[in-house]
From Swiss-Prot:
Organism: Mycoplasma genitalium (strain ATCC 33530 / DSM 19775 / NCTC 10195 / G37)
Membrane topology classification: Multi-pass membrane protein
Keyword Transmembrane included in the entry's annotation: yes
Transmembrane segments: 11-31, 515-535, 537-557, 558-578, 614-634, 645-665, 726-746, 762-782, 789-809, 816-836, 877-897, 903-923
Name used for this protein in its record: Uncharacterized protein MG277
Sorted UniProt keywords: Cell membrane, Membrane, Transmembrane, Transmembrane helix
Length: 970
């Protein structure tokens, strides 16, 4: 049997390369999607938002004592905070950082310098109010919860989310080294504390263990390696701890006796104190947390949401359950068995540690007692008992030491515990340093780098089961980030209240999480785009679809691999990446068909398509990348994360979406199979292939242009006099744009919750757009001339007017009290969308004419008129696709628990639609009209002439474009 046609080596190589690239592309899409669905760095995706208002005292301490908002305001030792606005700015920045570190990336924060609702609260003393209110910040963020995985009722789920929100925001991260009874040796607000010195140690060699280090400046000129421990003990003794549990009593004498937490001698009869220090990372947060647990009413929705540990803590505080026995280790109950803690304010910073644990007492002189037996002796009644302390866990006995014990809850607030001394052999012997202090003051790790004279190192962190383990680098770095962005010095949280903003989303598909359903929506969007591209452009569309899928999946995979959190911000960003890639791919496809309709062959059409789109695509992607890098540099937290995703997407879009598609198509077109028009064209377009006129080529020379290229006149003339009435509209919008910009700069609060979580990020987006736009203007002036530059400038101002107007309009129309939608990020994303459209118009208009600038006014009008008559349909499709994408996304996140709708999803569709209108039409129409009007003034002379060239007959017929009927029809 013979084949009618032999396959050439060229054909085999090209088709083999194509199949290899296609297989690799499909593998990348499938493997990348699988990896994303199994990724551990998945954030909340519209699981229902909560809004929490945190109230702060208007006063600050003048004598370094802590202020308690549940007690009557003292008459001395306090003063008013003078600059509330600046104070709240610091609080805002700290919250933006801490919530981002905790994994809440959809965060919005608003401020109120005098919140009158504080007067309605019953858990703060009214003497603290100033003019009937208190300063406050209101935080809205998404929480990750799946109701399908629990049997709890809706009210229990809601209560759990509210409590989670409270515990997430009632933090005041501040490093503090204290005695067990709350005497502060130093904290991170101390003038001698070197805040910049807090560092997470990078693991060395094969170890994965990290540590936290920081420096302090003792009141001594030089601290040597030999005097290190002695100097630190002298520093402790200088704090006048003679009456502290550190030096006297049985370790917890301050909370024993009548009217106190524990019975007399509950911790033994020793008299040398406990010699224990506690390193807190958030003691104020711990106090708020324990008080909130105490305030929960038994049997309430909040009570029913307690986990095992929280319920154990509640029972301890109320002397109920397993803590109602009257054991002298526990609470000093009265005759009726009631707890000595009558109200939340009875729990203070001074006695908080003793709820967590009972410190083991210190014996000044060692004895011959059985240390191990004594260590297990809960009562420690014999003052001669010596308890061996070799690590931080030995310094205390947990109040509940089992795996579900409540003491483990304190790992969110305590970093470490340090015993400073060990018993000596006999009275008068030199001080013996305990191993925990030796580790805390590692003599081999005293390289001072930040201006202190003593360096501390914490190599073991308190864990959730009450034990101590070495932290990994991520854990240490997280603590470091939280501690280096604290509240302002004067900040004291008064109280907080929270509520659900919208009904939480239920699983939209059985046993599928919200993230998975969102990812399914993402997959369907890519699939629909692939089908439509294939239907429109046949084989070209199929290759483009593969490149599109590989590009967007790679963007998310790489983003996740470098530490990004894949959440609602990521999905919003990647949907814009899809829409922008569609603009570029549609542009390539329509240029190809335009060449075909102009009687060029398939091969020549594709070559011209690449030639005339390469630089425009390169310019746009460079602009995209630079803008993302600028926003990364100028912004913080989730906005910075979004910019990271966009920077990655700029690279993957160019090399995968644009690069892979043109490689695949070029290889196939240049193969023998590329001559088969049925693989590329429908019969309507293929008819143009039979109209090839001759073997002539138009080459640049010195003859003048004619205007007879336009054989037919378009139905719509954008240069009619009536259309110039739009100039009046443009002038009004330009004025509005200036007003909007001034409003943003002067009164950003008018945008309310739709700004970013912190001021720097909002300003970073605006500055980034402005800087990159100015750079692009300077580039355009050199490359395209004055007409293009002025057209872009006016269009850009119109765009800004529209985008800012939409932000204000949206804030007014939807009247959302709080939302996790940050409209300021949409300004950046739609600016990118606009830039992609400008790139498309540039390719469509300028590059099609081989870089030459034209000066014949009639010709220019006809050229721009023809281009815009053809391009508006493509613009409409591209703009509609963005809204369509968000409709699909919303459909897969539709609904809510008990049938209540989450309207945030539908607000999102409307918001995208409004922004889309502001971006798609008037600015682009203005760009074309002004550019066409001004182009005759670009006096760069370039002429054409015909040059006859003899060629063997081929399908390639290089002729200049003649704008014949139907050439630009979509």
């Amino acid at each position: 049997m013979r084949f009618k046609k032999r396959f050439s080596l060229d054909w085999i190589l090209k088709i083999g390369t194509i199949l290899g690239l296609v297989c690799l592309g499909l593998f990348g899409v499938i493997f990348g999607s699988y990896k994303l669905l199994n990724d551990s760095r998945l954030g909340a995706v519209f699981n229902g938002s909560t809004t929490t208002t945190v109230y702060f005292l208007n006063h600050k301490s003048t004598n370094n004592t802590s202020l308690d908002p549940q007690q009557t305001k003292p008459t001395n030792g306090i003063e008013n905070i003078t600059n509330i606005d600046s104070f709240l700015d610091g609080v805002e920045k700290s919250y933006a950082n801490s919530l981002f570190i905790q994994g809440f990336s959809s965060v919005n924060i608003t401020k109120n310098t005098n919140d009158k609702t504080a007067s309605e609260l019953d858990n703060i003393d009214k003497s603290w109010l100033v003019n009937g209110g208190l300063p406050s910040v209101t935080l809205t963020f998404e929480q990750n919860r799946e109701q399908a995985k629990t049997r709890q009722r809706k009210r229990q789920v809601d209560a759990q989310v509210r409590r989670n929100a409270i515990s997430s925001v009632e933090h005041n991260y501040q490093l503090s080294l204290e005695t067990t009874d709350g005497v502060v040796l130093f904290d991170s607000l101390d003038n001698n504390f070197i805040n910049a010195s807090i560092r997470a140690v990078v693991p060395q060699n094969t170890s994965v263990n990290s540590a936290l280090t920081f420096e302090y400046k003792l009141n001594k000129n030089v601290v040597t390696k030999e005097s290190l421990h002695t100097d630190f003990l002298d520093f402790i003794n200088s704090k006048n701890l003679s009456s502290s549990d550190y030096n006297t009593g049985n370790g917890q004498a301050s909370v024993e006796g009548n009217g106190k937490f524990f019975k007399q001698n509950a911790n033994g009869t020793s008299s040398s104190g406990n010699k224990t220090l506690v390193l807190w990372k958030d003691k104020q947060g711990a106090l708020n947390y324990v008080r909130n647990i105490f305030n929960v009413v038994e049997g309430s929705s909040d009570y029913l949401t307690f986990n095992e540990r929280e319920k154990s803590l509640w029972e301890f505080l109320h002397a109920k359950g397993s803590f109602a026995s009257g054991d002298n280790l526990f609470l000093n109950t009265d005759a009726n068995g009631a707890s000595p803690i009558k109200k939340a304010s009875d729990i203070t910073l001074k006695n908080l540690y003793y709820i967590y644990a009972a410190p083991n007492h210190f014996s000044a002189v060692a004895s011959n007692s059985n240390d191990n037996n004594n260590q297990n002796n809960n009562n420690n009644n014999n003052s001669s008992d010596v308890i061996t302390v070799s690590n931080s866990a030995d310094t205390r006995k947990l109040r509940s030491a089992d795996s579900s014990g409540f003491s483990g809850l304190f790992h969110n607030y305590i970093i470490s515990e340090i015993r400073t001394e060990d018993p000596v052999s006999k009275t008068g012997d030199p001080v013996k340093i305990n191993p925990t202090l030796q580790s805390f003051l590692d003599t081999n790790n005293q390289r001072i780098e930040y201006g202190g004279n003593i360096k501390f190192q914490v190599g073991n962190f308190l864990s959730s089961d009450g034990t101590y383990t070495p932290p990994n680098f991520v854990t240490a770095a997280t603590v470091k980030e939280l501690l280096t962005n604290p509240f302002p010095t004067a900040a004291t949280i008064a109280t907080a209240k929270t509520s659900l903003v919208n009904a939480p989303l239920a699983n939209t598909i059985t046993d599928v999480s919200n993230f998975a359903s969102s990812f399914i929506a993402f997959g369907i969007i890519v699939l629909i785009a692939a089908v439509l591209l294939t239907l429109r452009y046949k084989l070209l569309g199929l290759y483009k679809a593969l490149a599109l899928g590989l590009s967007v999946v790679s963007s998310l995979v790489i983003f996740s691999a470098v530490g990004g959190v894949v959440d609602v911000f990521s999905f919003v960003g990647i949907f814009f990446v899809i829409a922008i890639n569609l603009i570029n791919l549609l542009n390539l496809g329509e240029l190809f068909l335009r060449n075909i309709r102009n009687n060029a062959s398939i091969i020549e059409s594709w070559k011209l398509c690449l030639k005339r789109s390469f630089f425009a695509n390169l310019e746009f992607h460079i602009t995209w990348l630079i803008s993302a890098l600028v926003v990364i540099y100028l912004s913080n937290y989730q906005v910075q994360q979004l910019a990271n995703l966009m920077a990655i997407s700029a690279i993957t879009s160019y090399f995968f979406s644009y690069g892979i598609s043109i490689v695949l198509i070029s290889l196939f077109v240049s193969s023998e199979s590329g001559a088969n028009w049925k693989l590329f064209l429908y019969q309507k377009d293929a008819k143009a292939l039979t109209k090839t006129s001759s073997n002539y080529s138009l080459l640049s020379s010195t003859s003048d242009l004619n205007t007879d290229f336009f054989i037919t006149k378009n139905q719509h003339d954008f240069f009619l006099k009536n259309n110039w009435k739009f100039l009046f509209v443009w002038l009004i919008l330009l004025a509005i744009g200036v007003v909007m910009l001034v409003l943003y700069l002067v009164q950003p609060n008018l945008l309310g919750e739709f700004l970013a979580a912190d001021v720097e990020s909002s300003n970073g987006i605006i500055a980034g757009i402005g800087i990159v736009s100015l750079l692009y203007l300077a580039y355009c002036l050199i490359r395209y001339g004055v007409a293009y530059c002025l057209s872009y400038l006016v269009s850009f101002i119109l765009l800004c007017s529209g985008l800012f107007a939409v932000m204000y309009l949206t804030n007014y129309l939807f009247s959302i009290d709080q939302s996790t939608i940050q409209l300021i990020t949409f300004v950046y994303l739609f600016w990118l969308f606009f830039a992609a459209k400008v790139s498309q118009t540039t390719t469509w208009t300028y590059f099609y004419w081989f870089k030459r600038s034209l000066k014949d006014k009639v010709f220019i009008k006809n050229l721009f008129n023809d281009n815009f008559n053809s391009q508006w349909k493509i613009d409409l499709i591209e703009s509609s696709s963005l809204v369509f994408i968000f409709i699909i996304y919303s459909g897969f996140n539709f609904g809510g628990i008990d049938g209540n709708f989450n309207l945030v999803i539908f607000y999102l569709i409307a918001i995208v639609g409004l922004f889309d209108v502001a971006t798609a039409f008037l600015p682009m129409f203005c760009f074309g009209l002004i550019n066409g009007w001004l182009s005759p003034f670009n006096y760069v002379h370039s002429r054409l002439s015909l040059k006859h060239k003899k060629h063997p007959f081929k399908e390639i017929d290089q002729i200049e474009e003649q704008l014949i009927a139907g050439i630009n029809s979509f």
